[in-house]
Regions:
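Contiguous mid-protein beta-loop-alpha structural module that forms a pocket-lining wall or clamp
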Residues: 37-41, 57, 77
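Acidic carboxylate motifs that coordinate Ca2+ or other divalent cations, activating on Asp/Glu
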Residues: 53
Length: 202
């Protein structure tokens, strides 16, 4: 760790959908920051058979908004701009730059293992294809978790999601449910998109 350093982080947020953020330093959640952005953490994963055909056809990630406190270093969070084309500028003086590492948040159901992994690397879609989990997802520019195509990539300072069926699992999941995972704010409706409009994930 490097102690007593000045850090500046800048990132453009093109729309008002949720995206992931993963930083190696702590960020105070101030009123000024909340004037322009919303932050959240993952709380749970849910799946449902909405048409009663014996097959899971909807998977959701539940998140909870952060109203105060601190975003901890090396911990995956979610960020949403309150207006389009907003620039996130974080300036932290005399702070600690923590050693970068991948942090994994495990959020499993009875039959499925989910993992949210923070990354500082630029990971190509072809690299995900060779990893051990069943499926990998990143948040698209339109705000939902989508499977990462081989011709796309994950940018640094973000998180990805993996999903693996447990051995002996009787669960059947539809192709549509496996293709995308919605993000739902606790107590509110779902967010997501009907189809991929851009292979680039942010």
């Amino acid at each position: 760790d490097l102690v007593g350093v000045n850090i500046e982080y800048t990132r453009g947020l093109h729309n008002t959908e949720w995206n992931s953020i993963y930083l190696p330093f702590e960020v105070p959640v101030t009123e000024g920051l909340l004037d322009e952005f919303e932050f959240a953490y993952v709380n749970d994963m849910h799946s449902a058979d909405t048409d009663d055909n014996g097959e899971i056809d909807e998977i959701e990630m539940e998140i909870v908004k952060i109203k105060t406190g601190t975003l901890h270093a090396n911990h995956p969070y979610f960020i949403r701009a309150k207006s389009e084309y907003t620039i996130l500028q974080l300036s932290c003086e005399n702070t600690t730059l923590h050693a970068t590492k991948e942090t994994t948040l495990n959020c499993s159901s009875i039959y499925m293992d989910y993992a949210i992994v923070g990354s500082y690397k630029h990971i190509k879609g072809t690299e995900f294809a060779s990893m051990p989990a069943d499926r990998y997802y990143a948040i698209s520019i339109d705000g939902g978790w989508w499977q990462i195509p081989e011709d796309s990539s994950l940018y640094p300072f973000r998180a990805y999601l993996s999903m693996t069926a447990r051995d002996g699992s009787p669960v059947k999941v539809s192709d549509e449910a496996m293709r995308s995972i919605r993000i739902r704010e606790k107590g509110e409706g779902t967010t997501g998109i009907e189809e991929i409009t851009d292979n680039r994930v942010e």
